[in-house]
């Protein structure tokens, strides 16, 4: 499994519907990039100047909102994931 370093978080982005409410199929260039995802793994956190670690405020299994253009897409074992910095996470969805 992927183990993020520092303050990075691995997400499984939630995909949007491929059809509109009216049943129109959307082309791939029209669909918005996902902005919600499930936390798969969390790094140890960033190191502060005094040497202490500041862990990200999320945990595995959380559903989160993130900035639209945040992170890097990676493929691992045939699955696509998004690796983002904790600062790019906007909120936890409850």
Curated annotation (Swiss-Prot):
Disulfide bonds: none annotated. Keywords: Chaperone, Cytoplasm. The keyword Cytoplasm applies. Its main location: cytoplasm. It is found in: Cytoplasm. One of its GO terms (cellular component) is cytoplasm. One of its GO terms (molecular function) is protein-folding chaperone binding. GO terms for biological process: chaperone cofactor-dependent protein refolding. Pfam families: Cpn10. Gene3D superfamilies: GroES chaperonin (2.30.33.40). Heptamer of 7 subunits arranged in a ring. Interacts with the chaperonin GroEL. Belongs to the GroES chaperonin family. Together with the chaperonin GroEL, plays an essential role in assisting protein folding. The GroEL-GroES system forms a nano-cage that allows encapsulation of the non-native substrate proteins and provides a physical environment optimized to promote and accelerate protein folding. GroES binds to the apical surface of the GroEL ring, thereby capping the opening of the GroEL channel. This is Co-chaperonin GroES. The gene is groES.
């Amino acid at each position: 499994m992927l183990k993020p370093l520092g303050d990075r978080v691995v997400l499984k982005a939630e995909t949007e519907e491929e059809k509109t409410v009216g049943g129109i199929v959307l082309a791939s260039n029209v669909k918005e990039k996902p902005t919600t995802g499930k936390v798969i793994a969390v790094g140890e956190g960033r190191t502060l100047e005094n040497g202490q670690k500041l862990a990200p405020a999320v945990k595995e299994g959380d559903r989160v909102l993130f900035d639209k253009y945040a992170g890097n897409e990676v493929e691992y074992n045939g699955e696509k994931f998004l690796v983002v910095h904790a600062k790019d996470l906007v909120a936890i969805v409850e």
